[in-house]
Amino acid sequence: AAPPQHLCGSHLVDALYLVCGERGFFYNPKGIVEQCCHKPCNIFDLQNYCN
C-alpha cells in the first residue's frame, strides 16, 4: 500500500475518484480534509468515504 500522504483540494478529490471508482464517494469536506489534508492519510482512510 502507498505510504500515508497529505491530500488537499483537487488532489484529494482525484484520489477519491481513483480509490472509489464507480461506487462514487460521500464528500464531507470537514471530515476528510481534517483527516487527509491537515494530517496524512492512507488508502484505507480514503475507502471509508466511498459510497
From Swiss-Prot:
Pfam families: Insulin. It is found in: Secreted. GO terms for cellular component: extracellular space. Gene3D superfamilies: Insulin-like. The keyword Endoplasmic reticulum does not apply. The keyword Oxidoreductase does not apply. Keywords: Carbohydrate metabolism, Disulfide bond, Glucose metabolism, Hormone, Secreted. GO terms for molecular function: hormone activity. One of its GO terms (biological process) is glucose metabolic process. Disulfide bonds join C8-C37, C20-C50, C36-C41. InterPro entries: Insulin (IPR004825), Insulin-like (IPR016179), Insulin-like_sf (IPR036438), Insulin_CS (IPR022353), Insulin_family (IPR022352). Belongs to the insulin family. Insulin decreases blood glucose concentration. It increases cell permeability to monosaccharides, amino acids and fatty acids. It accelerates glycolysis, the pentose phosphate cycle, and glycogen synthesis in liver. Heterodimer of a B chain and an A chain linked by two disulfide bonds. This is Insulin-2.
